[in-house]
Amino acid sequence: MAPPRKRGRGSFRGSSRGARKPGNARGGRNSFQTSRIDEKREIESSDEENQFNGFEDDVSGDDEPVQDEEIVDSSSEDEEATTERPYNSLLQLLNANSETKHARKRRKLDRAGSKSQDIRDVEIQASKEVEEQDVLENQEASEEEDNAEADKAGESEDEDEDASDPFETHIASLDEAETTKRVNEIKSDKWRSIKSSLPENFRLIYNIPDGEGGSWSMPSAVKTTRSLKLKKKLVSRAAEILPSFEGVAQNIASLVFNYSDVLFAGRTPSNAAQMRDLLSLHSLNHVLKTRDRVIKNNARLSRDTNEDIEVRDQGFTRPKVLVILPTRQACVRFVESISKIYQPEQQENRKRFMDEYHAEDNESWASKPDDFRDLFGGNDDDMFRIGLKFTRKTIKYYSQFYNSDIILASPLGLRTIMDKEDEKKRDHDFLSSIEIAIVDHSDGLLMQNWEHVEYICEHLNLQPKEAHGCDFSRVRTWYLDDRARYIRQTIVLTSFLTPEINSLFSQHMQNIAGKSKILPQYNGAITEVALPITVKQTFSRFDSTFALKDPDLRFKYFTTAILPALARSVTGKGEGNGAGTLIFIPSYLDFVRVRNFFATSSQATNISFGAISEYTEQSEMSRARSHFMNGRLSVLLYTERAHHFRRYNIRGVKHIIFYGLPENPIFFREIVQYLGQDPGVLAGTAGAENLDVRAVFSKYDAFKLERIVGTQRAGNMLKEKGGDTFRFV
């Protein structure tokens, strides 16, 4: 759980945080008092939480009352027919026919206890209960606004089709024979890899479907947006916002605009804004080309009514771009990027959007690391979903999904409407025609619940269960042939690569235009540790032959090779004893296992310990930290997710044991620097000499190890046959 915030702290927060713990939602109870703590009862007394415990209809998670829309509590059809309420009066002024019908639908959805409120302005703020229904209420796409603008579009938006435009070659005018060939190669897992070095110490792995060894070449790097095939409307603004691409961004821009799948594992707070602008430009370019093509063909068909013209320019449903983000503030940043590029004359419901999604940064977090503020700054609520619709001059926020061009959502927010308990209400057809899927800040999503991301990816580009007003005569053939997943472009940005994200690359990136993995060369987090003294760091490798057995073998190694020495040193006297030992445990399940062992095993009888996990109460966290700093606790168990959400500076640390390496290399540096938090220890030469770090790893920790010790060292440490212990000073 992240530190409390002024906004965005809804009841869904805990529901999105990774695998469910096998016990109660709160761990570490009274852990600071004794080694025989009550936490064992906590684990044994409750079954595993339901994965969707806490899912409600409340969307924004705010405690603030809805002020801009009257919510009618209706108990009968007669009450629903009433038209004298202020809400209906306002709607009648705007649009007496269509909007009143919509209001009636909304009242039927709102009868579960909603309270009336006064109307304050024209931007009607929907209730949180209504929002979940509204995004799917109208399941037929509306072309009326687009058709009304067809003549206007001809004046400035009509552009000649460019055969060299990747939009034409990959989306609009696919070669069916070549597409069939590449799809078959992908199904047969026939990929050819091209590797190369990129600027800024990155390396590229470019995979292409190629079963016959044909000639392929990687897209050339681009230095400015002038080299991109953009809509005329976007050209000048793109040049202002993205005047040039430097370093690895030149290659990323080229791959993105050529519709290749991209996994970029070098996202940082410093390059996040440029990546966001680049992806916003690409998304807008794709949406505008798609919609303008439809509008132009609508006008053509209306003029040439006597000709038998076949037009294939659509998918099953309207949404074409899906953006998965970790927080509402991240959504605000992405939408702001879209808005500044598009420059609409009007933005409908923007005030409501900013009220519900934006929040100022917490001033008390000024000392927090940049990556922490980048993820949790502003409104860090992880339960949201919103649709954007584009017309020639307007961006419409909160458009219903089947009338939206771009959908932005958190994994939890999207899954709650896709996976309802009532099977009749389950719906994912709005994802059937997604052509660009963007997953930003994937490493942040890992600390929520990655299963939601996998679930969404599994439901992309499936054949729809209903027609939703689709004109099948205009659906592109590769949709009808169930090949959309091979055309869809997937773009994933992450700060580091993990097995889960790598699995996404392997299983869900199946693009006929190829897929690229851009990885950094690491010098190692151990080279970035800032301590005024030299600390001995020991890495111990244990043999693990099978991934599923890795947790058991790790636990066995810890209890037989590390814990006995720790138990002896804790009872010892002098500077070299084991008091002040922090045990960092990445997995919550491993944390529970180790905690229970400390509480029940005779081997740990004389060890006083505390435990801090992501589920520990705030008061218990503070108490455990205080007692550990004062020496009343010899050992403190600490999880990676607790550090992710809190970023504590823990005092009193003299020895560090990494039960497993952290996913985030920044965490390794921060944890090791705990050794420099106690001036009293650093002042004494004997005390400083006894500070040490020990880390345990196996071959399945290859990604983690590379980030911590460096790319070259990691390879040697994993392959070394002369020994399993490696020391760094």
Swiss-Prot record:
A GO BP annotation: maturation of SSU-rRNA from tricistronic rRNA transcript (SSU-rRNA, 5.8S rRNA, LSU-rRNA)
Q: In what ranges is there compositional bias, type Basic residues?
A: 1-10
Q: Does the keyword Nucleus apply?
A: yes
Keywords attached to this entry: Nucleus, Ribonucleoprotein, Ribosome biogenesis, rRNA processing
* Ranges of biased composition (kind: Basic and acidic residues): 110-130
Q: Where is the composition biased (Acidic residues)?
A: 45-81, 131-148, 156-165
Annotated region Disordered: the residues are 1-165
**Bias (Polar residues) ranges:** 85-98
The molecular function terms of the Gene Ontology recorded here are: rRNA binding; U3 snoRNA binding
Gene Ontology CC terms, in alphabetical order: nucleolus; small-subunit processome
Gene3D superfamilies found in the cross-reference section: P-loop containing nucleotide triphosphate hydrolases
Any Pfam family? Utp25_C
- Database matches in InterPro entries: P-loop_NTPase, UTP25, UTP25_C, UTP25_NTPase-like
Which superkingdom heads the taxonomic lineage of this protein's source?
Eukaryota
Which compartments is it annotated to reside in?
A: Nucleus, Nucleolus
- Give a short account of what the protein does: DEAD-box RNA helicase-like protein required for pre-18S rRNA processing, specifically at sites A0, A1, and A2.
Oligomeric state and interaction partners are given as: Component of the ribosomal small subunit (SSU) processome composed of at least 40 protein subunits and snoRNA U3.
- Annotated PANTHER family: ORF PROTEIN-RELATED, U3 SMALL NUCLEOLAR RNA-ASSOCIATED PROTEIN 25 HOMOLOG
Q: What does the similarity note say? A: Belongs to the UTP25 family.
- The name on file for this protein is U3 small nucleolar RNA-associated protein 25
Species, as recorded:
Talaromyces stipitatus (strain ATCC 10500 / CBS 375.48 / QM 6759 / NRRL 1006)
Lineage of source species: Eukaryota, Fungi, Dikarya, Ascomycota, Pezizomycotina
